[in-house]
């Protein structure tokens, strides 16, 4: 059906603006991806307890479209929470490599972001970003569940912005 835009009244134009969405396929895919994140949990220390609380009834991450997955092949977000040791680093990288594209990483807590209180230990990695690229950092020792939900929302915003601009957002 062809629409003659010049013959429409102002009220009809306003009705079209309210009810018709104009977008690109990339933006639509970005919206769908951002609203159906499936995180792979990688809990290594006390931050993992806070991450488990997000999946509980009080916070209920499922209502945001995120479902925790146990397999990296079914996940598109890796949430690293806790102290990453040099012995654990190759396993973390292998799990990241097994995730399908597009994939994102959230570093949760002081240990995952910068080594935490164990930063001077010989066996601790000084931030998970030395192993895998990190998209969102969540500070705290441990961060509360609301901070993790906020970090997931920031990741959703980043995914939508990347889909809209077509460029990688730092």
Swiss-Prot record:
Its cofactor is [4Fe-4S] cluster. GO terms for cellular component: plasma membrane; respiratory chain complex I. GO terms for biological process: aerobic respiration; electron transport coupled proton transport. One of its GO terms (molecular function) is quinone binding. Binds 1 [4Fe-4S] cluster. [4Fe-4S] cluster binds at residues 46-47, 111, 141. It is an enzyme of class 7 (translocase). Its EC number is 7.1.1.-. Keywords: 4Fe-4S, Cell membrane, Iron, Iron-sulfur, Membrane, Metal-binding, NAD, Quinone, Translocase, Transport. It is found in: Cell membrane. Gene3D superfamilies: 3.40.50.12280. NDH-1 shuttles electrons from NADH, via FMN and iron-sulfur (Fe-S) centers, to quinones in the respiratory chain. The immediate electron acceptor for the enzyme in this species is believed to be a menaquinone. Couples the redox reaction to proton translocation (for every two electrons transferred, four hydrogen ions are translocated across the cytoplasmic membrane), and thus conserves the redox energy in a proton gradient. HAMAP family: NDH1_NuoB. NDH-1 is composed of 14 different subunits. Subunits NuoB, C, D, E, F, and G constitute the peripheral sector of the complex. This is NADH-quinone oxidoreductase subunit B. It comes from Geobacillus thermodenitrificans (strain NG80-2). The gene is nuoB.
């Amino acid at each position: 059906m062809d629409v003659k835009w010049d013959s429409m009244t102002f009220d009809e134009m306003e009705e079209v603006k309210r009810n018709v969405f104009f977008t690109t396929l990339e933006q639509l895919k970005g919206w769908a991806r951002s609203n159906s994140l499936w995180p792979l949990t990688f809990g290594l220390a006390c931050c993992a307890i806070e991450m488990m609380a997000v999946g509980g009834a009080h916070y209920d991450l499922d209502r945001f479209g995120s479902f925790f997955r146990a397999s990296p092949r079914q996940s598109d977000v890796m949430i690293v929470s806790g102290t990453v040791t040099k012995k654990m680093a190759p396993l973390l990288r292998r799990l990241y490599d097994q995730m399908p594209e597009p994939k994102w990483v959230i570093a949760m807590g002081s240990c995952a972001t910068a080594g935490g209180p164990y930063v001077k230990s010989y066996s601790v990695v000084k931030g998970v970003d030395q192993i895998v690229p990190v998209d969102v950092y969540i500070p705290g020792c441990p961060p509360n569940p609301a901070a993790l939900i906020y970090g997931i929302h920031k990741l959703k915003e980043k995914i939508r912005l990347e889909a809209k601009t077509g460029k990688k957002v730092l």
